[in-house]
Regions:
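RNA-binding accessory domains that recognize and position tRNA/RNA substrates
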Residues: 1-120, 134
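Cysteine-nucleophile active-site neighborhood
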Residues: 119, 124, 128-184
Length: 184
């Protein structure tokens, strides 16, 4: 892609919010592309988590962790905490970071029943990041509702939203995503 004034695009998105878009290397008719875009489904109400979660519970073993790296603990701490991680689309680096912090991890699918998690007798439950509309991931936050008060729970990104929904919060999509300090 070339010839796009990215600064003008960023200003437009800032003022008008995030937009659906379409790019094609085969269709060049603007009206046809506009029709295809109008017919495309939105992400609102779509549970994308079920398409990216692991299919079955498994132990996460980070045997191939580098001995050191600049952005995390220098060496993995001995496993002190048994943590069950709900996989809502978790990134491997996050699991590796938890291992480095001393967690013994069991990763479970996004819709694993709370009773099954509690039967694992974890010291804590981690809710991972993931894609899509948090309101569409009902099965996860319903399980979190059953875990609250029984085991410590922590999360990141979508995981925070799952905890909030389980506690009765309502989600509202921001006009545009927040991606750091260099906002236009």
């Amino acid at each position: 892609i070339e010839g796009v004034d990215t600064r003008a695009l960023v200003r437009h998105l800032r003022d008008n919010g995030s937009k659906m878009g379409i790019i094609s290397t085969e269709i060049f008719d603007v009206d046809e592309l506009a029709e295809r875009l109008a017919a495309a489904p939105t992400l609102v109400g779509e549970n994308l988590v079920k398409t990216v979660s692991c299919p079955a519970p498994h132990e996460f073993v980070a045997a191939d962790l580098p001995a050191t790296h600049d952005f995390a603990l220098a060496v993995a701490a001995p496993a002190r905490h048994k943590v069950v991680a709900y996989d809502c689309g978790v990134k491997r680096g996050i699991l590796e970071g938890l291992v480095r912090a001393g967690c013994d991890l069991t990763v479970v699918p996004w819709d694993t029943p709370a009773r099954q998690v509690l039967d694992m007798n974890p010291d804590g439950v981690f809710l991972s990041n993931g894609p899509g509309d948090p309101d569409a991931v009902v099965e996860t936050y319903e399980q979190v509702q059953q875990l609250i008060g029984k085991v410590p729970i922590f999360g990141i990104c979508l995981g925070h939203q799952m905890i909030s929904l389980a506690c009765g919060a309502q989600m509202e999509k921001l006009k545009f995503g927040h991606r750091g300090g260099n906002q236009p």
